[in-house]
UniProtKB/Swiss-Prot annotation:
Keyword Mitochondrion: yes
Single GO MF descriptor: ATP binding
Transit peptide start-stop: 1-52
Assembly and interaction partners: Subunit of the heterotrimeric GatCAB amidotransferase (AdT) complex, composed of A, B and C subunits.
Classification via NCBIfam families: gatB (TIGR00133), PRK05477.1-2 (NF004012)
Organism: Aspergillus fumigatus (strain ATCC MYA-4609 / CBS 101355 / FGSC A1100 / Af293)
Compartment list: Mitochondrion
Family designation: Belongs to the GatB/GatE family. GatB subfamily.
Name the UniProt record assigns to this protein: Glutamyl-tRNA(Gln) amidotransferase subunit B, mitochondrial
Entry-linked PROSITE patterns: GATB
SMART domains: GatB_Yqey (SM00845)
Pfam families in alphabetical order: GatB_N, GatB_Yqey
């Protein structure tokens, strides 16, 4: 009834709304206020602060955000520097790498990881009573290559030990390893800035390797929540080497660089077939913290004393996980010590994407493992002749290859040299060297100055242009898809200015897609050869481009903004016949017309 009266009497509605806003007074209507009326009234009386505030221009907002981000980074760096000044981080790493072998370490079962679960299993792998270990000598060769490449001293006599523990992935109740007398000792790995070490570590870090030991892998566990766990014993007794570094790492980035470098060394000498990305290499890190202004700690690790209590983080499966886990554990230990707590020696875990490590179990000591010599295995005796032959047959170490590629012979940047070495197990590097050799033969009629940049140009085409086509097509590297001679001929035509850069990329794509015509024939039949423009044609194109934007011309003349010449070059290339306008000549003509500078004699 009231609502109908209000609709028929707008003036009464206004009075009632005003009364609602003023609150109840004597003589006012006794009816309850309408549910929506106060809200309408309140909105009509309020003024929004955000509406009256000036809107910040987008460019200004972006600048403010960039400044805030820089300030945060400066604050973070200052905090990290203060932490480094006060606390000393010490890291040691244990790397477990699956060796490149066809048979297991103590049985003739296959090491294939693609077969049906539990199909490559010998009686000894499952610890059947009465079964005996049979050492497979073929597993020793990749292990020796790894040890030599890591600058270790090979021991003429080494022995196997049993490491006792009870877990479902180890059916024998012990793991065969080389705890007391490993086959290799006293090695090292050198790290440089291009390996990714922390800037505060300088230009060179040498990390000692305490020992490398042969051991057998465990079964692979697969969990199916909530309560099912399956075991694949194909992996049991797969040959491993455990590489134990000295605790000489003091930065998380350097810890990750160390693992990355060791993996690269192992792959370069064919000691392993896969790396961290496919599970062929796993890392455990030991982390300890101590205050720099206090007396050295009482703990010892790897023969180095004065350390804080260490914790071990198990089964890290990526380089980023190594760095992130060390950072998280460092921060956790610092927080515990600063709050008056005590670091417990324990084993901890790490989950990708997490910010904290988690406790798995109390750290087991050496006595708990009850190490003892394995009575079923004789000593491992390694002859000096075998070591000498393997040493002579090893490929050039990665560091020497980088030094060669970045030197005067090739002149590549470190950023280009590293992937050439690391990609495709050396196949990309071999292909690149073939391209350079052929290209230099094709350019013999040129002077030394013209030939000086051929290797750098070839590196760009192999890595970025051809590599980009492989990536885009999601294809593995195949040197026969674009033979080295074909790529060298394309680059040669480009160097002689018979084709443009765009045409060279077009021809490369055609060959990549299966065109097998010789390069000269392809260029002729597809009408891709560059037909140079005359000077008058360049002048006409330049004048047309200048006429499109006279304001920009004035900016170039008045403020010497030479970078804007590139816009006019682009316009000339768009207006001209495809493939005929050379950017360098277009730039020369533009400078002559706009700046009055001519390269003509």
């Amino acid at each position: 009834m009231l609502q109908q009266w209000l609709r028929q009497s707008p003036r009464a509605a206004r009075v009632l709304r005003g009364s609602c806003c003023r609150g109840p007074q004597s003589g006012s209507l006794r009816h309850s206020p309408l549910p929506t009326a106060p809200h309408r009234c309140i909105r009509s009386l309020q003024t929004s602060a955000t509406e009256s505030k000036e809107r910040i221009p987008l460019r200004k907002q972006l600048k403010q955000d960039a400044k805030a981000l820089k300030a945060q980074k400066r604050q973070k760096r200052a905090s990290e520097e203060a932490s480094r000044t006060k606390w000393e981080l010490t890291v040691g790493i244990e790397i477990h790498a699956q060796l490149n072998t066809e048979t297991k370490l103590f049985s003739r079962a296959s090491t294939s990881n693609t077969d049906t679960p539990n199909s490559n299993v010998a009686l000894f792998d499952l610890a059947f009573p009465g079964s005996q270990p049979e050492f497979q000598a073929t597993a020793l060769l990749p292990a020796l290559r790894a040890a030599i490449a890591l600058n270790c001293d090979i021991q003429p006599v080494s022995r196997f030990d049993r490491k006792h523990y009870f877990y479902q992935d180890q059916p024998a109740g012990y793991q065969i390893t080389q705890y007391y007398e490993p086959f290799a000792k006293n090695g090292y790995v050198d790290l440089f800035p291009h390996d990714g070490i922390a800037p505060e570590d300088g230009d060179h870090v040498r990390i000692g390797i305490k020992q490398i030991q042969l051991e057998q892998d465990t079964a692979k566990s697969q969990e199916y929540p909530p309560s099912t766990q399956l075991l694949d014993f194909n992996r049991v007794s797969h040959p491993l080497i455990e590489i134990i570094t000295m605790p000489q790492i003091h930065n998380p980035a350097t810890a990750a660089a160390c693992v990355r470098k060791i993996q690269a060394v192992l792959q370069s000498c064919s000691a392993v077939t896969t790396g961290m990305e496919l599970g062929g290499l796993r890392a455990d890190v030991n982390v300890s913290i101590r205050r720099r202004d206090e007396a050295p700690g009482t703990h010892q690790y790897g023969g180095i004393g004065g350390l804080g209590q260490r914790t071990e983080i198990k089964n890290l499966s990526s380089f980023k996980a190594v760095e992130d886990a060390v950072i998280a554990e460092k921060n956790r230990q610092i927080a515990v010590l600063e709050s008056g707590g005590v670091i417990e020696g324990e084993t901890r875990g790490w989950t990708i994407g997490s910010t904290e490590t988690r406790k798995l179990r109390g750290k087991e000591g050496e006595v708990d493992y009850r190490y003892m010599p394995d009575p079923d295995l004789p000593p491992l005796i390694i002859g000096h002749d075998l070591i000498s032959n393997l040493r002579d047959s090893l490929p050039t170490p990665p560091d020497q290859l980088i030094e060669m590629l970045a030197g005067t012979e090739y002149g590549l940047s470190i950023e280009d040299a590293k992937p050439l070495i690391e990609l495709d197990d050396g196949a990309r590097l071999e292909y690149y060297q073939d391209v350079v050799d052929i290209l230099r033969d094709l350019q013999q009629d040129k002077d030394a100055k013209s030939r000086g940049g051929l290797a750098r140009m070839a590196g760009n085409w192999v890595l970025h242009e051809l590599g980009g086509l492989c990536t885009k097509a999601d294809l593995a590297w195949d040197a026969q898809r674009v033979p080295a001679e074909t790529l060298a001929q394309i680059i040669d035509q480009l160097q002689r200015k018979r084709i443009t850069g765009a045409t060279a990329k077009q021809v490369l794509a055609m060959v990549f897609d299966g065109d097998r015509r010789p390069v000269p024939q392809l260029l002729e039949e597809e009408n891709l050869l560059l037909r140079p423009l005359s000077r008058d044609e360049y002048l006409a194109l330049a004048e047309a481009a200048i006429g499109q934007n006279p304001q920009m011309v004035e900016q170039i003349r008045a403020k010497n903004q030479l970078g804007k010449l590139g816009w006019f070059v682009g316009q000339m290339m768009r207006m001209g016949e495809k493939g005929r306008v050379e950017a360098q000549k277009a730039d020369e003509i533009l400078r002559e017309l706009i700046l009055g500078k001519s390269d003509q004699p």
